[in-house]
């Protein structure tokens, strides 16, 4: 059963007046569930940045409604928006730390701005320093920290006021792969420990695959696909999603792709698999049941949300079309997706 919606977007639009109106968000509806990690992905210009600015009230929508914990916040004044904005944490690609302040004071800054006394600020900042793994760095200055450590400070600062939701705007895009992984693991840990809702705005499928529970794909201001991450990875439907997945999933080697024909001696098949079938010798089972021996041309196995998924490219003898048809049907039943790409 899904958790209740923390934020609901109802047919929102945001257009910018130029010589021709450009709608960065176009009649978009979305529910963000309490406690989930939601990945929002799309190419440059898809509307991701505008969406996050609408979520935190920095952009005002032109049409539709935004509900925060059931309250319509779409038309609130800046003063009325303030208490809701305090429930939203933000982390960015650039860390935006105060170079003249030590780590403890950087983290405590949001509390100082809201009038929390020094003793409480100090206590809360120390708790967050421990949470993000920076014990011993309390009195260091930003210039003394690595990029990953600076982002940990940014995360701690975003949590200072105990937000209900954390918005991450390309927060790992400036980091190296190893540091990116450590930051994503930290966010996943914070999500579990605090039951904190996290929205990841990113153009990187690797980020979504690593920790998101659900993914939304944006294109030209509209949601073109959404669902559980493992479902999107194994059975993408929209061309935008398929194109973005090509960057992070195995592809048919060029020596086969450039020689595909309508007919041939060997059928080239793509199959996506998930769950129990990944633990079985299913190609042996295929040979036993259908009588065709498949060869693996390329592929890979990965783990998404604790479930094993895979994408394989197979070659199957095509001389017996009836047997081939049965084999494709058998593979379709066993896998999430199966397609004959052509013949060689």
UniProtKB/Swiss-Prot annotation:
Can you say where in the cell this protein is located? Cell inner membrane
Q: Which GO terms describe its cellular component?
A: plasma membrane
Xref: InterPro entries: AAA+_ATPase, ABC_transporter-like_ATP-bd, ABC_transporter-like_CS, ACT-like_dom_sf, MetN_ABC, MetN_ABC_transporter-like, NIL_domain, P-loop_NTPase
Q: Name one GO molecular function term.
A: ATP binding
List the Gene3D superfamilies.
3.30.70.260, P-loop containing nucleotide triphosphate hydrolases
Q: Name one Pfam family in it.
A: NIL
- Decide whether keyword Cell division is in the record: no
Q: Which reaction does it catalyse?
A: L-methionine(out) + ATP + H2O = L-methionine(in) + ADP + phosphate + H(+); D-methionine(out) + ATP + H2O = D-methionine(in) + ADP + phosphate + H(+)
> What is the topology of this protein in the membrane according to its UniProt annotation?
Peripheral membrane protein
Which UniProt keywords are present, listed alphabetically? Amino-acid transport, ATP-binding, Cell inner membrane, Cell membrane, Membrane, Nucleotide-binding, Translocase, Transport
Where does the ABC transporter domain lie?
A: 7-245
E.C. number(s) listed in UniProt: 7.4.2.11
- Annotated ATP binding sites: 42-49
Is Kinase there in the keyword field? no
Self-association and partners: The complex is composed of two ATP-binding proteins (MetN), two transmembrane proteins (MetI) and a solute-binding protein (MetQ).
| Function text | Part of the ABC transporter complex MetNIQ involved in methionine import. Responsible for energy coupling to the transport system.
Question: Member of which family?
Answer: Belongs to the ABC transporter superfamily. Methionine importer (TC 3.A.1.24) family.
Name of this protein = Methionine import ATP-binding protein MetN
The scientific name of the source species is Bartonella henselae (strain ATCC 49882 / DSM 28221 / CCUG 30454 / Houston 1) (Rochalimaea henselae)
Classification from the root reads: Bacteria, Pseudomonadati, Pseudomonadota, Alphaproteobacteria, Hyphomicrobiales
User: What gene name does this entry carry?
Assistant: metN
């Amino acid at each position: 059963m899904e958790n209740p919606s923390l934020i609901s977007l109802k047919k929102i639009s945001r257009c910018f007046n130029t010589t021709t109106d450009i709608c960065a968000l176009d009649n978009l509806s979305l529910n963000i569930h309490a406690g989930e990690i939601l990945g929002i992905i799309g190419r440059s210009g898809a509307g991701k940045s505008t969406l996050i600015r609408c979520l935190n009230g920095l952009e005002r929508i032109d049409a539709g409604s935004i509900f925060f914990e059931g309250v319509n916040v779409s038309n609130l004044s800046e003063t009325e928006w303030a208490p809701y904005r305090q429930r939203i944490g933000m982390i960015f690609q650039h860390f935006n730390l105060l170079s003249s302040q030590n780590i403890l004071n950087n983290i405590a800054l949001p509390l100082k701005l809201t009038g929390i006394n020094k003793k409480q600020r100090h206590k809360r900042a120390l708790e967050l320093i421990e949470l993000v793994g920076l014990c011993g760095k309390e009195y260091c200055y930003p210039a003394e920290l690595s990029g990953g450590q600076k982002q940990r400070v940014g995360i701690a600062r975003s949590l200072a006021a105990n937000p209900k939701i954390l918005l991450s705007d390309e927060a790992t895009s400036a980091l190296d792969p190893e540091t990116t992984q450590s930051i994503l693991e930290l966010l996943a840990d914070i999500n579990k420990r605090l039951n904190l809702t996290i929205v990841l705005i990113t153009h990187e499928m690797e980020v979504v695959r690593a920790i998101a529970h659900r993914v939304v794909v944006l294109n030209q201001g509209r949601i073109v696909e959404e669902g559980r991450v493992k479902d999107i990875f194994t059975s993408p439907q929209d061309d935008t999603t398929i194109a973005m997945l090509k960057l992070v999933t195995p592809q048919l080697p060029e020596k086969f792709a450039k020689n595909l024909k309508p007919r041939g001696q060997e059928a080239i098949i793509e199959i996506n698999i998930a769950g129990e079938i990944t633990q079985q010798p299913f190609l042996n089972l295929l040979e036993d049941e259908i009588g065709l021996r498949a060869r693996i041309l390329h592929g890979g196995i990965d783990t998404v949300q604790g479930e094993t998924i895979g994408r394989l490219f197979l070659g199957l003898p095509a001389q017996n079309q009836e047997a081939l048809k049965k084999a494709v049907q058998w593979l379709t039943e066993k896998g999430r997706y199966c397609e004959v790409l052509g013949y060689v």
